[in-house]
C-alpha cells in the first residue's frame, strides 16, 4: 500500500501522458481536464459491495421500466405519479421515440450511477446518467497502472478484478441484438450471472 501511495505522482504523470481526460461544461463551454488519480483506495468489503450491486441492478431495472412506460402506456402520468408537463417538456424526452420499444424493452444499456457515502456509512445515489455515461475507461487504466506501481498491494489483498469489463459489455450488447446467434463469451471471472438485464 505504501508503494502505491508513494507512486501517486508517477501514476498521474502516466495518465497525463496517455491523455486520460474528462470533459465538463462550465459557463456553457466545454472544457477538458486531466483525470486525477487518488492512490488511496476506497475499500468496500465483498458483502457490502454485493448489497450495493444488487441495489444498482434493481435501480436500473426500475429506470428501464419507467422509460418503457413513459414511451408506451404512460401509466405513470395517467395515475398522477408525475405531472404530464414535467414528463413531456423535459429536454431528455424524445418525441421521436414515442411508442418505440427497443429489443427486450431495454432503453438504457449502460448506466452511470454516481454514488456517495455519508459519514455514517450509508450509500446514496447522487445522480443517474442514462444518456451517454462516460468514464468506464478510467478505473480500467487506473487499476492497470496501480498494479504496475504496487503489485504487492494486489498480491496481498483480495481485490475484485475489473479487466473483464469489455467482455461483459459485449455480452450485454449481444443480449439485445435481435439478429444474434449463440455468441456467449466465456470469461474466467465473468460476473454475467449478477448483471442486470440492462447491464
Write out the residue ranges for each language-model feature.
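Preference for protein termini
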Residues: 1-199
Amino acid at each position: 500500500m505504501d508503494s502505491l501511495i508513494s507512486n501517486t505522482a508517477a501514476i498521474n504523470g502516466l495518465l497525463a501522458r496517455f491523455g486520460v481526460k474528462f470533459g465538463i461544461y462550465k459557463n456553457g463551454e466545454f472544457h477538458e481536464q486531466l483525470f486525477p488519480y487518488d492512490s488511496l483506495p476506497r475499500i468496500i468489503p465483498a458483502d457490502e459491495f454485493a448489497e450495493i450491486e444488487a441495489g444498482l441492478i434493481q435501480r436500473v431495472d426500475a429506470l428501464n421500466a419507467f422509460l418503457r412506460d413513459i414511451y408506451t402506456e404512460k401509466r405513470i402520468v395517467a395515475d398522477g405519479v408525475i405531472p404530464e408537463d414535467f414528463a413531456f417538456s423535459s429536454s431528455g424526452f424524445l418525441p421521436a421515440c414515442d411508442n418505440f420499444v427497443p429489443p427486450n424493452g431495454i432503453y438504457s444499456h449502460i448506466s452511470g450511477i454516481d454514488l456517495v457515502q455519508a459519514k455514517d456509512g450509508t450509500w446514496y445515489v447522487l445522480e443517474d446518467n442514462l444518456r451517454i455515461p462516460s468514464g468506464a475507461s478510467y478505473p480500467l487504466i487506473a487499476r492497470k497502472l496501480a498494479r504496475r506501481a504496487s503489485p504487492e498491494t494486489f498480491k496481498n489483498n483480495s481485490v475484485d478484478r475489473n479487466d473483464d469489463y469489455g467482455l461483459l459489455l459485449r455480452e450485454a450488447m449481444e443480449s439485445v441484438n435481435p439478429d444474434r446467434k449463440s455468441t456467449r463469451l466465456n470469461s474466467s471471472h465473468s460476473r454475467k450471472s449478477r448483471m442486470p438485464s440492462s447491464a
